[in-house]
Amino acid sequence: MADGVDHIDIYADVGEEFNQEAEYGGHDQIDLYDDVISPSANNGDAPEDRDYMDTLPPTVGDDVGKGAAPNVVYTYTGKRIALYIGNLTWWTTDEDLTEAVHSLGVNDILEIKFFENRANGQSKGFALVGVGSEASSKKLMDLLPKRELHGQSPVVTPCNKQFLSQFEMQSRKTTQSGQMSGEGKAGPPGGGSRAAFPQGGRGRGRFPGAVPGGDRFPGPAGPGGPPPPFPAGQTPPRPPLGPPGPPGPPGPPPPGQVLPPPLAGPPNRGDRPPPPVLFPGQPFGQPPLGPLPPGPPPPVPGYGPPPGPPPPQQGPPPPPGPFPPRPPGPLGPPLTLAPPPHLPGPPPGAPPPAPHVNPAFFPPPTNSGMPTSDSRGPPPTDPYGRPPPYDRGDYGPPGREMDTARTPLSEAEFEEIMNRNRAISSSAISRAVSDASAGDYGSAIETLVTAISLIKQSKVSADDRCKVLISSLQDCLHGIESKSYGSGSRRERSRERDHSRSREKSRRHKSRSRDRHDDYYRERSRERERHRDRDRDRDRERDREREYRHR
């Protein structure tokens, strides 16, 4: 009978696993690193939530209710109670959390697992802690929120999906607000009854309603103004836009650059390096493009920045501190100057990452005395990766200084460039002749001029054979130019002839019309004379008839 019950439980688990695989079919190709460090468990969250959070190991209560054994085999066979500890800074390590728990008298810690971003391996600001007794869990929930870890009061909650989703949503909102926030804002986000994570920091916000006393930080300050006041012994929040690294003592600035004022941050610990720098407009989780901006030399492990109030990012002069204040450098591209106050970069030569940090997102340690740059980028003389101005390949502007500075060419290179010049010359001449025969003299002249300039700019332009090519091109050019000018004069002459012929025709026409007009008037006058003569004759005839009648 017991075997039957076991078979039923096993089939129930298989069904759940198949359902989970059907639901999360698009997440089969997940990084192997996440599969190794995270215990697998079934949860009913949406697929988009699974992209941002690690899987939740089953608690003791879930094991009793489902009657199924956990997928991960633990070495500890006794009782196990899981808790969430949140509101931690992103640089809080498992050693820090272990020391804080041991200071409360809790020594039965079974597991500490930090929740991290899969994009860059950075901590989300909360962890899963497993203890071996109810008394230890109650002690943690009662006493740990009263302690401070790096200026933050931890929040302890039971381990269930509700609190996990709240932590994840809060971390996600912080990530989006940190990426979309403006550059150079001074002061933390506005205060209220419900505190949020400060922009730019991962997992630093307070859990809503977990610890009484309202918000930890005061209201926002306008950009360019002085920072808001903070209580004694409490560090101000970090500036927005990207998770900044803990800076060390500033070194000498590079030539022509001005270092920004030092920022307050966490002490640099040897067991947890800072995450990579996030520049504005860069896709989240991709390595920085081009060389990294030069930063201060790395501090000695175990020593952090000296105490004292940090200078403001912009606005009035900073208060006196251990280091003399420096004015911030001019605003510009993030790759041309040292890291501005809102983009502090990680110090080079950082120690290897802690066990819960993905080592694939951090570069290997380099020389601790020199600023690092991306191995794929050009040397830091030109931050935009432009080549030296004198290197222009086979073709460049003519000049004696450049010819003397060039290294001598080998025979193979010389022949290759010479063959190229011959091909350019022959093709240009043939095309120019065809264009000129078609009457397109402008295109022919332009083709020859371009070919001459290309051959003159080559590395072998001083050779006699190259000069012969240039002279042949110039002769062809002069011939086409003279032909184009001659055709123009012939056209002018023909036009003049046409004009003269038209003038003669017009003159002839005018003279003919005048003659015709005169002839017409002559004819008219003759007709008038004839009519007059006829009238006279009639009058005479009438007079004669009258005289005859009177007789």
Swiss-Prot record:
Residues 389-404, 489-503, 515-551 have a biased composition (Basic and acidic residues). GO terms for molecular function: exon-exon junction complex binding; mRNA binding; ribosomal large subunit binding. The modification Phosphothreonine is found at residues 157, 404, 407. It holds the Pfam family RRM_1. The keyword Transferase does not apply. Residues 81-161 form the RRM domain. Induction: Up-regulated during spermatogenesis. Residues 1-213 are annotated as: Necessary for interaction with NXF1. Residues 184-193 have a biased composition (Gly residues). CDD domains: RRM_CFIm68. Component of the cleavage factor Im (CFIm) complex that functions as an activator of the pre-mRNA 3'-end cleavage and polyadenylation processing required for the maturation of pre-mRNA into functional mRNAs. CFIm contributes to the recruitment of multiprotein complexes on specific sequences on the pre-mRNA 3'-end, so called cleavage and polyadenylation signals (pA signals). Most pre-mRNAs contain multiple pA signals, resulting in alternative cleavage and polyadenylation (APA) producing mRNAs with variable 3'-end formation. GO terms for cellular component: cytoplasm; interchromatin granule; mRNA cleavage factor complex; nuclear speck; nucleoplasm; nucleus; paraspeckles; perichromatin fibrils. The lineage of its organism: Eukaryota, Metazoa, Chordata, Craniata, Vertebrata. It is found in: Nucleus; Nucleus, Nucleoplasm; Nucleus speckle; Cytoplasm. Residues 405-551 are annotated as: Necessary for RNA-binding. The modification Phosphoserine is found at residues 494, 500, 511, 513, 525. Belongs to the RRM CPSF6/7 family. It comes from Mus musculus (Mouse). This is Cleavage and polyadenylation specificity factor subunit 6. GO terms for biological process: co-transcriptional mRNA 3'-end processing, cleavage and polyadenylation pathway; mRNA alternative polyadenylation; positive regulation of RNA export from nucleus; protein heterotetramerization. A motif (GAR) lies at residues 202-206. Contains an Arg/Ser-rich domain composed of arginine-serine dipeptide repeats within the C-terminal region that is necessary and sufficient for activating mRNA 3'-processing and alternative polyadenylation (APA). It comes from the Eukaryota. The gene is Cpsf6.
